[in-house]
């Protein structure tokens, strides 16, 4: 898989910061991840020139000098003293907020600054990945973002409805294997938790506080009724509500899964072997897995395709089959 541009630039910055001397272009091509993908010396040279210009545009002090007194070849390095940031320490909430903001900002005038800031933070060893921190970020107003680039098409509509205090109506399903049902909700805010978006609000149909994953909401979200009809109750902690909903705890249930011989190593490690078994003429074994999150387990098993087959429970098997059919349909 080809290395992304941002990852390649981060690798280059780290390499040029880690040396007191100068590194030749040839050494960079052979040792810095992302450049070995170049099909030719000419292609590498063009890519490297673009990357050098980009680093300079970002304000990174790239220096050029002779590799040694006996070697006239030019090399490159980054002046540590000029580049060094004062110590940057972000709390989990702050780190997650930075990462979420970069997902939301898409305007041309912001994207360069966003990528530049991320590049400097990551190269300085600052973790800004919400999937790693696991920290949730709550957004209760469309004013919190200037542009939307998320995969959830309904996010902008929900944020506008939250701003105006309008009730929303949409179709929703609890899992891929279940049918959609129409829900009428007083929206309070949206929260990102472990890379997913959730709507928190009062479900009028259930007369209770509910959490809805945005990826399970249908494409049509309709604001209904007058503006100002809903308010967020005082003292409501959106992040706490979502965290309690999605936190993985033992359910007491077990899944029985067949895995092909030599495949699905991570799944094998997580489970307990129940003995060898052939399935469809293939050698393998049956493993037992504790179900902490049915959704997460279904996603993981789906990723192994025909190398992992759910035997029990039926609900998990149906969920995995629905995901596989959806993937096959998308590729058709």
Swiss-Prot record:
One of its GO terms (cellular component) is peptidoglycan-based cell wall. PROSITE patterns: WYL. Disruption phenotype: Cells lacking this gene are not severely sensitized to RNI and display no accumulation of the proteasome substrates mpa, FabD and PanB. Residues 147-227 form the WYL domain. Signal peptide: none annotated. Belongs to the PafB family. PANTHER family: PROTEIN PAFB (PTHR34580:SF3), PTHR34580. Part of the pafABC operon, however PafB does not seem to be involved in pupylation or substrate degradation. Appears to play at least a small role in resistance to reactive nitrogen intermediates (RNI) in vitro. Interacts with PafC; with which it probably forms a heterocomplex. This is Protein PafB. It comes from Mycobacterium tuberculosis (strain ATCC 25618 / H37Rv).
